[in-house]
Curated annotation (Swiss-Prot):
The organism of origin for this protein: Xanthomonas oryzae pv. oryzae (strain KACC10331 / KXO85)
Descriptive protein name: Small ribosomal subunit protein uS14
Positions of the UniProt region annotated as Disordered: 33-69
GO CC entries: cytoplasm; small ribosomal subunit
Biased composition (Basic and acidic residues): 51-68
GO molecular function, one term: structural constituent of ribosome
RNA-binding as UniProt keyword: yes
Assembly behavior: Part of the 30S ribosomal subunit. Contacts proteins S3 and S10.
Any GO BP: translation
Gene3D superfamilies, per database record: 1.10.287.1480
């Protein structure tokens, strides 16, 4: 089980990323635009730098819903490999079963 402080920190980062997503996208669009002047791009760049660091989506870490494990998480199920195995063995995941050949 991951530390609860790490799990809460990651939840906070996800909320911030969602909150500032529109503003961040608008500023990035100005930066990538060929029509914008040099001054507009500099202004957009400074505004982008002043946004909270944790509002960047790349700082959000996918974690297991049950254990909080940061690595070995399957996106499709939202579970870590260990918890996915347990859920599969219990028959909690429809259509998923242990491979046998």
């Amino acid at each position: 089980m991951a530390k609860t402080s790490m799990i809460h920190r990651d939840i906070k980062r996800a909320k911030l990323a969602k909150k500032f997503a529109g503003k961040r996208d608008a500023l990035k669009k100005i930066l990538s635009s060929q029509d914008a002047s040099y001054e507009e791009k500099i202004d957009a760049s400074t505004k982008l730098q002043k946004l909270p660091r944790d509002s960047s989506p790349s700082r959000h870490r996918n974690r297991c819903e049950l254990s909080g494990r940061p690595r070995g998480v399957y996106r499709k199920f939202g579970l870590g490999r260990n918890m996915l195995r347990k859920a599969t063995m219990n028959g909690d995941v429809p259509g998923l079963r242990k491979a046998s050949w």
